[in-house]
């Protein structure tokens, strides 16, 4: 049998070599052999060492010994500001790779490791101090961490403070620097049971030293999310506060909050605003609500489901109490939902149903002036507009009354509408023709006019329409393409196509994103896909699944107490009485895995 040819090269590595080398160097140090430098710590204590070991262990010593500094040739090097016991620990680490961090040495060792550039030791000290965070030291610990650029410890301290702000003492909170308090108030993670607590935190800080701090009140109030302060508190406490009453910027913030609560503030038509985002700790969430539609057997659905994108959970809301039929329209007005019109195939409906989100109930309100189907509804300046080919009317929820308006100048079949920049826009084909046009309604003049917006995209029929950040988005029903119109610049644009077609799907705006759900996909299969478009990244992503494949459904977004929470206010603040408890709805059971595809 022929022997194999010998190897020309035999790769070899000893995994124990590094540890063996460290042990050897440590032994040489103990035997005081080949030592070529002595470090002198505070107090005059000497530490003999090897330059090569120090330079390899620390960029600080590498720069000292490898450069042209006097220390590169000196036999003795004096280190200022380093306690002897901390230098001992760092030298031991250089030779062993081990250090014992304790409550007695963590902070001074971190300071020394930061000065002498031992990042691993610094990180270990920071990790140890994270475990020691408590109510008594968290504020000082954040100061310490930021002073020494310990990002991990600083972040952990801030998370601890935000989570336990209600348990911190008044004196601790009142001595916060302005920048730190603003950072806490602006953070989504600030754990308060209600937004009133954030307001009280800011107000207490100002009242602790009014002569010096009153000038900062507008800046602080802007960091409070006033739209989510309960209405009775807004009127009884915020509006009555002298610091607010005599400050024009504060009055503007108060007016914004009142407009929001009165459904006169269209958050989708404006740019992103942190004040319009509830804090997770309050239990409020902006949710996607699905109403009606048909399942894959074409059976009508009367269920009302809501989806919380923060948790990915679905819940049942109160079922629609009547036969929905077809051709109805759905819109959100504030935090309530309105279903208008429709038909049962033989007669048209003039009825209007309102879903009251605060009590999780449906109730009929004043009927429309005219029965209709396949119309469109939108909200502009707190009023509900219903637009059909031959008529337009407007509903005022404060008086529960309808008002007839001028009809469109050019009647359009099966149009879609959206409110943008203080105007109402309608898109559709001229009655009896295939020509697509856009018309605009001015509420100040009660007049419709054609919009000279150039060549419209080649739509086969009216696309689904929504407004986001002052732009109008048009989601085609027969393709995955999406068009965008900027009414201010009178310009058209396209965004990346959706991941799939959503024929008969639904469009809504939620959390600064477009949400398209359900409908038939590219393979003509009924889909349960929910995908979202983020304008910041200009990308679509699948964010969830419907409870079941659905088409011809309506979807809107509202703010609601999605998950009930219990919360201890602690001693940092006390809330005034006042209840706004609401039915959170029933959890929707998970679908049978066999139904998923």
Curated annotation (Swiss-Prot):
GO terms for biological process: cell division; chromosome passenger complex localization to spindle midzone; proteasome-mediated ubiquitin-dependent protein catabolic process; protein ubiquitination; regulation of cytokinesis. The keyword Acyltransferase does not apply. Kelch repeats lie at residues 287-335, 336-382, 384-422, 423-470, 472-512, 513-560. GO terms for molecular function: cullin family protein binding; ubiquitin-like ligase-substrate adaptor activity. Pathway: Protein modification; protein ubiquitination. Residues 35-103 form the BTB domain. It is found in: Cytoplasm, Cytoskeleton, Spindle. It comes from the Eukaryota. The keyword Cell division applies. Residues 583-597 have a biased composition (Basic and acidic residues). Keywords: Cell cycle, Cell division, Cytoplasm, Cytoskeleton, Kelch repeat, Mitosis, Repeat, Ubl conjugation pathway. Coiled coil: none annotated. Residues 570-597 are annotated as: Disordered. One of its GO terms (cellular component) is polar microtubule. Component of the BCR(KLHL21) E3 ubiquitin ligase complex, at least composed of CUL3, KLHL21 and RBX1. PANTHER family: KELCH-LIKE PROTEIN 31, LD33804P. This is Kelch-like protein 21. It comes from Homo sapiens (Human).
């Amino acid at each position: 049998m022929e022997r194999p040819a010998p190897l020309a090269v035999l790769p070899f590595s000893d995994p124990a070599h590094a540890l063996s080398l460290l042990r050897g160097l440590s032994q040489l140090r103990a035997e005081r052999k080949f030592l070529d430098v002595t470090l002198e710590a505070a107090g005059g204590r000497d530490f003999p060492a090897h330059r090569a070991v120090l330079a390899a262990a620390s960029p600080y010593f590498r720069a000292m010994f490898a450069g042209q500094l006097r220390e590169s040739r000196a036999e003795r090097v004096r280190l200022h500001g380093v306690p002897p016991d901390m230098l001992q620990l760092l030298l031991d680490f250089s030779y062993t790779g081990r250090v014992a961090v304790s409550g007695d040495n963590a902070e001074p060792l971190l300071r020394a490791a930061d000065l002498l550039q031992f990042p691993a030791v610094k990180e270990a000290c920071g990790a140890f101090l994270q475990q020691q965070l408590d109510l008594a030291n968290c504020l000082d610990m954040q100061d310490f961490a930021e002073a020494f650029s310990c990002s991990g410890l600083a972040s952990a301290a801030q998370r601890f403070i935000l989570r336990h702000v209600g348990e911190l003492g008044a004196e601790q909170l009142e001595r916060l620097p302005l920048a730190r308090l603003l950072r806490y108030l602006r953070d989504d993670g600030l754990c308060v049971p209600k937004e009133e607590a954030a307001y009280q935190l800011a107000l207490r800080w100002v009242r602790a030293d009014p002569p010096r701090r009153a000038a900062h009140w507008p800046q602080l109030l802007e960091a409070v999310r006033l739209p989510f302060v309960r209405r009775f508190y807004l009127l009884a406490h915020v509006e009555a506060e002298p610091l607010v009453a005599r400050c024009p910027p504060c009055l503007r913030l108060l007016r914004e909050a009142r407009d929001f609560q009165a459904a006169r503030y269209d958050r989708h038509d404006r740019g992103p605003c942190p004040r319009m985002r509830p804090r997770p700790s309050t239990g409020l969430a902006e949710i996607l609500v699905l109403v009606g539609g048909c399942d894959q057997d074409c059976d009508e659905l009367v269920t009302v489901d809501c989806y919380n994108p923060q948790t990915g959970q679905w819940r049942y809301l109160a079922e629609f109490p009547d036969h929905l039929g077809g051709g109805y329209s759905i819109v959100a007005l504030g935090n309530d939902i309105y279903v208008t019109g429709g038909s049962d195939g033989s007669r048209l409906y003039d009825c209007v149903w309102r879903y009251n989100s605060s009590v999780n109930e449906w109730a009929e309100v004043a009927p429309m002036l005219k029965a209709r189907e396949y119309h469109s509804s939108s909200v502009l300046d707190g009023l509900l507009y219903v637009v059909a080919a031959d008529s337009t009317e407007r509903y005022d929820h404060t008086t529960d009354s309808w008002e007839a308006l001028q009809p469109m100048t050019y009647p359009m079949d099966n149009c879609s509408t959206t409110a943008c920049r203080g105007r109402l826009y309608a898109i559709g084909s001229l009655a009896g023709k295939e020509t697509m046009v856009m018309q605009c309604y001015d509420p100040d003049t009660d007049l419709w006019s054609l919009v000279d917006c150039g060549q419209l995209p080649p739509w086969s029929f009216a696309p689904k329409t929504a407004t986001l950040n002052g732009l109008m988005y048009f989601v085609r029903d027969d393709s995955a393409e999406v068009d965008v119109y900027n009414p201010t610049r009178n310009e058209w644009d396209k965004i990346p196509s959706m991941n799939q077609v959503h024929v008969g799907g639904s469009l809504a705006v939620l959390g600064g994103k477009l949400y398209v759900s359900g409908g038939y996909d590219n393979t003509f299969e009924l889909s349960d896909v929910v995908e979202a478009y983020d304008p910041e990244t200009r990308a679509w992503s699948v964010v969830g699944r419907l409870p079941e494949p659905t088409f011809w459904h309506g979807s809107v977004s509202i703010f609601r107490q999605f998950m009930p929470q219990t919360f201890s206010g602690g001693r940092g603040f006390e809330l005034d009485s006042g209840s706004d408890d609401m039915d959170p709805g029933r959890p929707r059971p998970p679908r049978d895995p066999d139904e998923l595809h």
